[in-house]
Every structure is written in structure tokens, then in C-alpha cells.
């Protein structure tokens, strides 16, 4: 007893004394503080193991502080601490189901919307049915409109009708030219027959040469070439037949020449030199000699 009195005076508790657990654990408060009137005496009296455990020496252990309410409930039941609020009245499985871990939703990063796929990629290939005959494409319009050409036989020529005498028909005779018409010309009140006028000449080369008759009373020159003529003529690069470069004089132009010579008193029975009249009355042409 003295020992107990001395120890109590020193503030120490005796070993045989009833141990009162501290109101709070040493830095291991798992739950919020509970008032003293809410003690679980009915649990201690009902369970002999728990009642006996309160008489045992309590040795605090340093445990890491749990970070979730589920861990708090399991640690309280494992250590036999009666500070839990109402956990002793429920089975452990029900407590774990009530305090399941509910993960907090994590914010998801919003990705930019992907561009829509082109329509060509989204189109699925057409379904091909089996045992369906494939029709060939229709021919082109040109081929439809055209028809194969059919060579028509040539019609035979009609035979020539036989003559009345029974002789075979002769070949057609070549066409002959009719006689030239005598063209008269009235010069200064005198009727002049041009067919009786002598052939015209030209002395452009130094020697008088005859002219060729052209048309009705007209004349053309054959000596007035590009080399020897005083009045050069163009050369034909593509001569055809007997065509040559020369000068010609129409019937009306030649009539003017005759009127001028008759007014001057020229004798028209003499050949007329047309050298001085080509430049004024003649024209350069590609003519054909007949």
C-alpha cells in the first residue's frame, strides 16, 4: 500500500490498479472525438473476450495514419478499440460494403474533334449477289446509230440502140467549130470589116512580129516577154498547157486604137504596129495560144 501511495504521489500508476485508457491515443486518432456517454458498455459486457481485453496492458503502436475511411474502420475493429461509432453492431462484411472505395472521377482531357472522314471512305462496296448474270455495258451511241455499209451493185449501162440499117452505132464525132462571124465596126461613119484588116504587128524586140488574134477582134502579144520586151511581163510559175505570159487587147480597146488612127489619117490597109498602144490599152494576162 505504501508503494502504491508513493507511486500515486509521484504521479505514477500502480501495476495492480485498474488501467484507464487515455481519452485519446498518442497521435493515432482514427475517428473524430466521441462523447463519453456514447460508450459501448453493452458490447463489453456481451463479449467476454473484449471484457477481459480491457484488463490487459495496452501498449500503443505507431501505425501509419490511414488515408481512407475504409482503412479507419478496419483498423478500429482489428485493434479492439471501442471508439468506433456503431461499427461493433454491424458485421464486418456489411461495414466493408458500406465503406467501399469510391474513386473520384478524374478530369478527362478534351481532345479536339477529329475531322469527318470523306464520303468516299465511308461508302461501303456494293453487295454483289451470287448467281446474278452481269450485263455488259450498252454500246456507244455512235455504234448504235451506224449500220454496216452494204455495197450496192452498179447498174449496168444501157446498150446503145442499134441503127435502123442494123449497123453497130459509131462513136460520137468530135465537135467542130463553126465559121467565124464577120464582125463589123463603124469607125467615123465608115463600116469596117475587121476580118479584112491585115495582121497586127509589134516591134518591141526591134523586128516586127505578128500578133496573135484573140477573141472577137482582139489581139495578144507573144514577144513581150520578161527578157526581150521593152515592157516586161510576169512569168507564170505554174504554166498549164500552152499558156504563156503576154499582153492582150480587147475588142473595145482595139476599136479605140482604130478610131485614133483613122482620125490621124492612117491607112488601115497597112499592118498596125501596136508597140505604142500596149501600155495604155493592153493588159497583162496569161493567155493561151490557139
From Swiss-Prot:
Keywords: DNA-binding, Nucleus, Transcription, Transcription regulation. GO terms for cellular component: nucleus. It is found in: Nucleus. GO terms for molecular function: DNA-binding transcription factor activity; sequence-specific DNA binding. Residues 138-158 have a biased composition (Basic residues). Coiled coil: none annotated. One of its GO terms (biological process) is response to ethylene. Residues 60-90, 102-183 are annotated as: Disordered. Residues 104-116 have a biased composition (Pro residues). PANTHER family: PROTEIN BASIC PENTACYSTEINE3. Belongs to the BBR/BPC family. Transcriptional regulator that specifically binds to GA-rich elements (GAGA-repeats) present in regulatory sequences of genes involved in developmental processes. This is Barley B recombinant-like protein C. The lineage of its organism: Eukaryota, Viridiplantae, Streptophyta, Embryophyta, Tracheophyta.
